Amino acid sequence: MFIAVLFTLWLAASAMAGEFTGPVVGVLAGDTIEVLHKKHPERIRLSGIDCPEKGQPFEEKAKHATSALVIGKEVTVQMHGKDKDRHTLAEVVLSDGTNVSKMLVAGGWCWWYPKYAQQNRELKRLESEARAGKRGLWADPYPVPPWEWQKWRKRP
């Protein structure tokens, strides 16, 4: 019985990690895309970053930047698990090796998300460079990170 439980847990963990390749068929937000996987669109949350939320300044520009980078292109999805909304959390890489999260941070369209990518020093460096260059949302003198913006919106 114990071995059966361990095997089931191992299978579940294996299903959350892994890799697949497919075309990007949709961009739902700056940090959320849909990739065709086994003939069905799978919602993918780009790991390590957080883009402006719906209604937040630069939300549409971040979504457009993501679309320009990935829509219709073949990508490799390196899955890391699920986010709080049960969407697949993953690194997404274009066929030429370009990491989508890194490109969005470098362009100034999102924040490095230290809560979930604290060890990713490259994202931190890319964000610092985008800030210094006032690229994307860093042109705003007081950009508000999505996690702070959500807290502010929830206040009565």
How should these model regions be labeled?
Residues 2-156:
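Small beta-barrel nucleic-acid-binding modules, primarily SNase/OB-fold domains
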